[in-house]
A protein has these predicted regions:
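Catalytic cores of secreted or luminal carbohydrate-active enzymes
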Residues: 2-29, 575-592, 598-616
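Binuclear metal-dependent phosphoesterase catalytic core
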Residues: 2-61, 92-125
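Aromatic sugar-binding surface patches on proteins
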Residues: 73-103
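Beta1/beta-strand and adjacent pyrophosphate-binding region of the FAD-binding site
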Residues: 128-138
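Conserved N-terminal/central alpha/beta ligand/cofactor-binding core
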Residues: 147, 153-154, 159-243, 247, ...
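Conserved beta-strand-loop-beta-strand element in the redox core of flavoprotein oxidoreductases
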Residues: 245-267
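Flavin (FAD/FMN)-binding glycine-rich loop and adjacent Rossmann-like elements that form
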Residues: 259-272, 276-583
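Extracytoplasmic Gram-positive cell-surface binding/anchoring modules and repeats
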Residues: 592-606, 610-665
Length: 665
């Protein structure tokens, strides 16, 4: 059902059909290898007339004009198959003369139906099939796609915005938090390429928030270069996720070109689907159960969790990259609507600052600016956590339109903070960088989300698992696929009711590893969840959400997906040790031991022995630098572990499940 839209320009009249519940430019429904039309592409072009062209393409080359025929729409036939289930039993699928068909070759990488109406408007729907589909090209997604491709799986990343890297680049958080002494895998490669670009690792220590800072556009360029080097990896930008259906052997996933109003659609059939979106939107659409907000103590067993659960998430930040335009420049922006200097007075030391700053240190204005100083000395990341530009909004269950509205509010806070910096602190020479983000307002493409949906996975990683990995009845450390050393860090001060939030006292934790089962949702097959939506408690998310961990999670997701495709197994049935073997061969830590770095002849040995628990390391907390050592006091233990690994191979002899428990063959 639908209606006609007529556009009048004097005596010139143009029109088009608009279906109910579809975008204005949606002019057809395409069926790829449908049950009723096997081996064919079939399009129902709703408002076809003889002046229209209906063409079929494969791999970007026109194959033929599609042949018109009379038949029944497959979707309508399915909907009206059982009259007894309908409110009006006399309704049925009828014949239409607006069907078009073309045979599909078996070896095409991509297919497209392209329709051109009498006025020259072009509408298209494309189809691809792949082994591994990664939705989201953020920090986790780009690593997942690259690794799956390296493992030999035909892989595809689909990212809505024009950049790769997510929070590291598209959100402007170009300061890496943690893992400086555990750089490995694709994360380590990215860091090495940054160092090469800027002239060494010392050049990356430009600000004091991190040992590795960089300009976001440089990070995006590096990620695109890394992706382009993988022959098994495809990449599509500008497509928004629309939905997914489970099939017998995987998923059929639907996308729409951003801003096309239904005129440019894409369907992808995949064996394994990876959700690497910023908020876990794909997992939710696929029916995965999930949690949002703070967990209760009774749910997680964490004694530092609040007594009652709630839906409060961490503050987000709409970062800005500032640029120094020179000492004589006046980049002062127009006073933002609703500007209130009082909310920023304790962001740094100043004539109006007070001692009521939640017990935090007040830095000088220049120190605050230098916090996010980027290499080159002319740009600064504005992502200040102390009465700065954090913003509270729980957008997880919002519609795209509602999210966009919330993001503009978050930008407003950053604009207000910038105005405060320019007018109250005297940095008139600083303004939004005009050569960083190709966006109308110069802001990043997306905000920085610190928290997302958290799935109910095969296992749930808690802060207790991290704090005392060897004391748990559930030895998840044996199943590690990523490591982190960042403290439990939560942002809540911009919540309007922050003073009444549950009081959380985060105790120090050693460095930790992330269990493989936290990536695998319960009861939903052929799906892996990465980024910040893994199965982790709200508290532990404060450590697992950081960029190095998220990139390693993505790399592990890529290995897991590729092995599932190669073996023809369900994701949950892929052995933990098989995934760990590939990661170790790729120079990735599975245990957070600092004794040896990847490339050392005994690195893999202590990683494997550590993951069996035969020799257990020692965790330490040193300020913000959390550590774990395999043999802190006796280096000879490393040689003994290497000998055990070589002669007895306990890592492979004992099979374990996703909980780290031994399983009898």
């Amino acid at each position: 059902a639908g209606y006609k839209i007529y556009n009048f320009d004097g005596t010139d009249v143009k029109w088009r059909f608009a279906g109910c519940d579809t975008g204005e430019n949606c002019q057809m429904k395409v069926y790829w290898d449908a049950e009723s039309f096997p081996g064919e592409a079939v399009a129902n072009v709703w408002d076809y007339d003889p002046q229209w062209k209906v063409e079929y393409f494969e791999d970007g080359v026109k194959v033929c004009d599609m042949k018109r025929f009379e038949g029944k729409d497959p979707y309508a036939s399915e909907v009206y198959r059982d009259p007894s289930s309908l409110k009006r039993g006399w309704v049925c699928a009828v014949l239409t003369q607006n069907l078009f068909r073309a045979p599909m070759s078996g070896d095409a990488k991509s297919r497209e139906v392209r329709v051109t109406d009498r006025f020259g408007n072009v509408f298209s729907e494309a189809f691809e099939s792949t082994g591994v589909l990664v939705v989201g090209g953020g920090a986790s997604g780009v690593a997942a796609g690259i690794q799956a491709a390296r493992c030999g799986a035909k892989s595809l990343i689909i990212e809505e915005c024009p950049w790769l890297g997510g929070m590291l680049t598209a959100a402007g958080v170009s300061a890496i938090d943690g893992n400086y002494n555990m750089r490995s895998g694709i994360f380590g490669e990215f860091c090495d390429r940054l160092a090469t670009h800027y002239g060494g690792y010392e050049a990356l220590k430009s600000g004091w928030v991190s040992n590795i800072l960089f300009e976001p556009h440089v990070g995006n360029e590096i990620f695109h270069k890394m992706a382009s080097e993988e022959k098994n990896l495809g990449l599509r930008h500008g497509y928004a996720f629309e939905g997914a259906e489970k099939t017998a052997d995987g998923w059929t996933v639907h996308f729409e070109k951003y801003g096309s109003e239904g005129g440019d659609k894409l369907t992808v059939r995949t064996k394994v689907l990876i959700d690497a979106t910023e908020l876990g939107d794909v997992a939710a659409a696929c029916g995965v159960k999930y949690r949002v907000g703070m967990d209760s103590r009774g749910e997680t067993g964490e004694d530092i969790a609040p007594e009652k659960a709630n839906d409060i998430v961490q503050d987000m930040t709409y970062v800005a990259i500032l640029k120094d335009y020179g000492p004589d420049a006046d980049m002062t922006i127009e006073r933002p609507e609703g500007y209130d200097a009082d909310i920023f007075v304790n962001s740094c030391r100043g004539p109006r600052s007070t001692v009521a700053n939640y017990g935090r240190i007040l830095w000088s204005p220049q120190e605050m600016i230098d916090y996010g100083r980027l290499p080159g000395g002319k740009k600064y990341m504005l992502n200040w956590p102390i009465d700065g530009n954090d913003y509270y909004a729980n957008v997880i269950e919002m519609s795209p339109e509602e999210r966009s509205f919330a993001y503009e509010k978050a930008k407003d806070i950053t604009r207000c903070f910038l105005y405060y910096i320019q007018t109250e602190l005297g940095f008139k020479n600083l303004g939004i960088a005009d050569d960083e983000f190709p966006t109308p307002d110069g802001f990043p493409f997306i905000p920085y989300h610190r928290e997302a949906r958290r799935i109910e996975g095969e296992v749930t990683f808690t802060v207790d698992h991290a704090a005392k990995p060897f004391d748990s009845d559930e030895p998840l450390y044996r199943t590690g696929i990523a490591v982190g050393d960042y403290p439990v860090d939560h942002h809540h001060y911009r919540n309007p009711d922050w003073a009444n939030l549950p009081e959380l006292h985060f105790y120090p934790i050693p460095s930790f590893n992330v269990p493989m089962g936290s990536l695998i949702p319960k009861a939903v097959d052929d799906l892996i969840v990465a980024e910040k939506s893994i199965s982790v408690t709200n508290i532990m998310n404060g450590s697992t959400r950081l960029q190095p961990v998220v990139m390693q999670i993505g790399q592990a997701a890529g290995v897991l997906a590729a092995l599932a495709v190669e073996k023809g197994e369900k994701v949950r049935d892929v052995p933990v040790r098989d995934v760990q073997d590939v990661l170790l061969a790729s120079g990735v830590y599975i245990m957070p031991y600092l004794d040896l770095k990847p490339g050392d002849e005994n690195f893999e040995a202590i990683q494997r022995i550590g993951a069996t628990g035969l020799i257990r390391g020692v965790g330490r907390n040193v300020d913000w630098s959390n550590q774990t050592w395999f043999a802190p006091d006796d280096p000879s233990i490393i040689l003994r572990a290497a000998q055990i690994d070589r002669t007895e191979d306990p890592f492979h002899k004992v099979k374990i499940d996703l909980h780290g428990r031994e399983v009898e063959e």
